[in-house]
Amino acid sequence: MSAAADVRAFIALDLDARLREAIGELQARVRPRLGGIRLLRPEGIHLTLRFLGDTSPAQVETLRPLLAAAAAACPPVEARVAGLGMFPERGSPRVLWLRLDVPPAVYELQRACERAAREAGFEREERPFRAHLTLGRWRDRAPRPDLPPADPGTTRLDTLVFFRSDLRPDGAVYTPLARFGLGA
């Protein structure tokens, strides 16, 4: 990071406890099929709207009111789990994810977060937004496993969170810098 006060940050939608519990059960069910994968703790899973990376204190302060306004303009929504997948789509998998079907309001919120990031001095994100929850990552090359159907149900998305991410040997630790209720 460029300065000691910088933080690694991202913007995400939080999940409800019911879906987190269902994700934990799904992970336990699929783990035997997924050799070499490191599964994320369910309490750390979220719907990332914009990864920021190194973020200065000034950028944090610029983003707070912009994210508050973006959250206020988006109503709470329901999202439906739509199955398991892997990135990349071909070859040796690196990431196991759970796809979400989300309403257009989530895409509008993601675009608002992108505009806020640009206004705070971040480069434009080149990768297209895909509504998904990262469940785990493979450490090494692995054969593509057959994935079972997954339908842990729906979740209510009602909170936008500006997170700090601290990387640790046992996994990342996410700390909210700010929370904003959708539609509030």
Name what the model sees in each region.
Residues 1-184:
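Histidine-dependent nucleotide/RNA phosphoesterase domain, centered on the 2H-phosphoesterase fold
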